[in-house]
Design a protein with these regions (language model features):
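Single conserved hydrophobic/aromatic residue that forms the stacking wall/gate
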Residues: 1-11
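Periplasmic-binding protein-like
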Residues: 16-25, 82-88, 125-134, 156-158
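Flexible loop/hinge segments that line or gate small-molecule binding clefts
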Residues: 25-64, 161-172
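Short, conserved loop/helix-junction motifs that constitute active-site signature segments
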Residues: 34-39, 77, 148-152
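Hydrophobic alpha-helical segments within soluble ligand-binding/sensing domains
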Residues: 48-84, 137, 177-196
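An alpha-beta-alpha
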Residues: 67-106, 199-211
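Short acidic low-complexity segments
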Residues: 115-123
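Flexible loop/turn connectors
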Residues: 123-128, 135-211
Length: 211
């Protein structure tokens, strides 16, 4: 059963379910309601940069793993004049990624920028963009087709979290992503066996023609 943000805390304090699979909506803190759940019954997914106590979890690392994924692409990124992270003000993505983005760019001497007002982004020749949300990917591709700029040649594009569409858009969009199938397998294993699991999935690079 899917439980939305308006769910009652009674759900947590009861024995309605044998297992709870929860994707926390804050990377920095755990909802206090969840502390009412027996740790043997709860699995936390995705966000998790907080004290998870005795709870099982399968989380993303939005910091070091993000840095190392960018480092794996450094030679491709050097083809461009500037690396731009699109980070809308209202995004749920952890802000700590911005710090590690800045660290990467400083360590490898790459000119960079973080853009929060993504509605006004102008695609420019010589820049490579990291788009966390799919809407920014779509807007950049649409704008480039209007201006005649070619993705992977005139400018670069990196998306976050892989989808089947990214494999075919403009001959393939390079992606930074965890293995979502592996996350699903580990969640199913927890439900079926009840065995404790505490792991961060690595951010993988799917290199395609967009950079």
């Amino acid at each position: 059963e899917m439980i939305g943000s308006d769910w009652s805390s009674d759900v947590c304090s009861s024995d309605l379910y044998n297992k709870y699979i929860v994707m926390n909506f804050d990377n920095e803190k755990l909802s206090p309601h969840l502390y009412k759940i027996d740790s043997s019954k709860l699995l936390l997914l995705d966000f998790g940069k907080f004290d998870k106590k005795d709870y099982s979890y399968v989380c993303q690392d939005f910091d070091d793993s993000f840095y190392h994924a960018l480092a794996a692409l450094k030679e491709h990124l050097r083809k461009y004049q500037r690396l731009v992270l699109l980070f809308p003000e209202d995004i749920k993505h952890p802000r700590s990624s911005c710090q590690y983005f800045n660290c990467f760019c400083q360590d490898y001497h790459i000119d960079s920028a973080i853009v929060e007002n993504t509605d006004r982004i102008q695609v420019r020749k010589g820049e490579v963009y990291i788009a966390i949300r799919q809407i920014e990917v779509v807007n950049i591709i649409k704008q480039s087709r209007t201006t005649g700029l070619k993705c992977g040649e005139d400018f670069g594009l990196i998306a976050y979290n892989d989808t089947p569409a990214y494999e075919v858009i403009d001959q393939g969009i390079t992606v930074l992503s965890i293995n979502w199938e592996e996350l699903g397998r580990k969640a199913a294993e927890f439900v079926l066996t009840g065995q404790e699991i505490r792991t961060y999935l690595p951010t993988e690079v799917h290199l395609r023609n967009s950079i």
